[in-house]
Amino acid sequence: MKIQDYTKQMVDEKSFIDMAYTLLNDKGETMNLYDIIDEFRALGDYEYEEIENRVVQFYTDLNTDGRFLNVGENLWGLRDWYSVDDIEEKIAPTIQKFDILDADDEEDQNLKLLGEDEMDDDDDIPAQTDDQEELNDPEDEQVEEEINHSDIVIEEDEDELDEDEEVFEDEEDFND
């Protein structure tokens, strides 16, 4: 059945991903995502607000369903239309090449390294601003006496002690 023959009830019941497969199969060419959504909206006589939730799921399905291929610029087609070599070419990431620097290059004063541009812009930032406190602020409270480690008491739960003893006993049984 062709996509143009769908009734509103059929559009309501069918998933957008299945309708997209039928639509692309009927058209035989790649389509922009927004054009696909506009086709669905027209078929079901929907307002944008009515299908907003379905569009989110549809986009997720497009990316995860193996039948579809994003061929760039938000254009979608069917994977069946492309050979393996075409698919690898269309979805292969482009790698930006960088020159490898040697010792002479590092000494070159005219050479800008990645990230140096951003550092130059930060030169006018003061080391301390008015809203910062000094570390040696006289208003800070002085600690009169330090706490001695022998004064610290740590309370342990009896349940934790029992578990530790059981683990220790299990280890002794294991070693026997």
Swiss-Prot record:
Signal peptide: none
Keywords: DNA-directed RNA polymerase, Nucleotidyltransferase, Transcription, Transferase
One cellular component term from this protein's GO annotations in UniProt: DNA-directed RNA polymerase complex
Domain annotation HTH HARE-type: ranges: 14-81
HAMAP family the record matches: RNApol_bact_RpoE
Function in brief: Participates in both the initiation and recycling phases of transcription. In the presence of the delta subunit, RNAP displays an increased specificity of transcription, a decreased affinity for nucleic acids, and an increased efficiency of RNA synthesis because of enhanced recycling.
Stated family: Belongs to the RpoE family.
Protein name: Probable DNA-directed RNA polymerase subunit delta
Protein's organism: Staphylococcus aureus (strain NCTC 8325 / PS 47)
Gene: rpoE
